[in-house]
């Protein structure tokens, strides 16, 4: 990666290290994200979204290895892993048993965690440079439509909001969500 392309990530990585919530393009809409290991940042994201912690959150990553500190990989058999890996990187979010030490702010009232390996190049670069996954939820204030452009993010959240500019992918719908243990579809994509 050139130093020029690395430079666009520097203020966003700094914001993440400073426990701030950021906005970035994903496959379908702009996402709001933060450091999953920062209770302060996760609480700020939940407050911004007016989202109850009990619902749980999604982690988005550059690769599966970034997710393993948060999920119980030993709960999966080879077939479940193969099915999951066949869909990644891509627009399928899998609900996987969480490690017991994974924050309840991430899992909510569940013993599982929703995770996805993104195929959006900016998300992959962002997670690689940050060195871990991000909490990911749609960029919109309660009652408003998810943002599909940087301009819409700035209209809803203000011009000073930490924003990784770029284009969303071509998907019209949010990611499909499936349970890895049962294969059950939780949300249609």
From Swiss-Prot:
UniProt EC number: 2.7.7.87
GO cellular component terms attached to this protein's record: cytoplasm
GO molecular function: ATP binding; double-stranded RNA binding; L-threonylcarbamoyladenylate synthase; tRNA binding
Keywords per UniProt: ATP-binding, Cytoplasm, Nucleotide-binding, Nucleotidyltransferase, Transferase, tRNA processing
Domain of life: Bacteria
One GO-annotated biological process of the protein: regulation of translational fidelity
Domain YrdC-like: 6-189
Catalytic activity: L-threonine + hydrogencarbonate + ATP = L-threonylcarbamoyladenylate + diphosphate + H2O
Pfam families to which the protein is assigned, alphabetical: Sua5_yciO_yrdC (PF01300)
Subcellular location(s) per record: Cytoplasm
InterPro entries (UniProt xref): DHBP_synth_RibB-like_a/b_dom (IPR017945), Sua5-like_dom (IPR006070), TC-AMP_synthase (IPR023535), TC-AMP_synthase_SUA5 (IPR050156)
Subcellular location, principal: cytoplasm
SUPFAM superfamilies (UniProt xref): YrdC/RibB (SSF55821)
Stated family: Belongs to the SUA5 family. TsaC subfamily.
Function according to Swiss-Prot or TrEMBL: Required for the formation of a threonylcarbamoyl group on adenosine at position 37 (t(6)A37) in tRNAs that read codons beginning with adenine. Catalyzes the conversion of L-threonine, HCO(3)(-)/CO(2) and ATP to give threonylcarbamoyl-AMP (TC-AMP) as the acyladenylate intermediate, with the release of diphosphate.
Protein name in UniProt: Threonylcarbamoyl-AMP synthase
């Amino acid at each position: 990666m050139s130093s020029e392309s690395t430079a666009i990530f520097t203020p966003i990585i700094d914001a993440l290290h400073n426990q701030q919530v950021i906005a970035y393009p994903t496959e379908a809409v702009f996402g709001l994200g933060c450091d999953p290991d920062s209770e302060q940042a996760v609480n700020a994201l939940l407050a911004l979204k007016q989202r109850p912690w009990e619902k749980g959150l999604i982690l988005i990553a550059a690769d599966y290895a970034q997710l393993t500190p948060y999920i119980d990989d030993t709960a999966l058999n080879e077939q479940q892993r193969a099915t999951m890996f066949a869909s990644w990187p891509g627009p399928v979010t899998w609900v996987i048993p969480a490690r017991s030490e994974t924050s309840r702010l991430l899992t909510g009232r569940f013993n599982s965690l929703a995770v996805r390996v993104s195929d959006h190049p900016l998300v992959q670069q962002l997670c690689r440079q940050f060195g871990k996954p991000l909490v990911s939820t749609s960029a919109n204030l309660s009652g408003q439509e998810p943002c599909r452009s940087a301009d819409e993010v700035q209209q809803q959240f203000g011009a000073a909001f930490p924003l990784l500019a770029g284009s969303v992918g071509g998907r019209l719908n949010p990611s499909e969500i499936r349970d890895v243990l049962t294969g059950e579809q939780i949300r249609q994509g």
